[in-house]
Amino acid sequence: MVRLPLTPAEVERGQRLGALLRRARGDRPMLDVALAAGVSPETLRKIETGRIATPAFPTIAAIADVLGLSLDELWSGVNRPAREPLAS
């Protein structure tokens, strides 16, 4: 299967997702969050840095659950217009 290159919008959305998850994780160790979500720390690191711009839904749902984020909250934070600033 050939994967199409990501669009600039998809890359930017992946970066917003990573930033949102990093903020939600706060001071919690990446290892603790990753293990609680059932993903590898490397996967979480790649998502947080935007290197995995389109992670699988179950992966994001598990991480969001561990971080106490609702999927609605996550979607609204990731899917906002590009010019809107990230919430602090």
Predicted regions: what is each one?
Residues 58-73:
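DNA major-groove recognition helix of helix-turn-helix/homeodomain DNA-binding modules
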Residues 51-56, 82-86:
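Short, solvent-exposed alpha-helical "recognition" segments
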Residues 22, 31-32, 61:
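Residues within the helices of the helix-turn-helix
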Residues 19, 23, 46, 65, ...:
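DNA-binding alpha-helical recognition surfaces that contact promoter or target DNA
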Residues 1-27, 72:
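A short, Lys/Arg-rich alpha-helix, primarily the initiator
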Residues 1-6, 75-88:
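Short, charged recognition helix plus adjacent turn
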Residues 27-29, 55-58:
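Residue-level signal for the short linker/turn that defines the boundary of a DNA-recognition helix
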Residues 26-46:
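Short alpha-helical DNA-recognition segment
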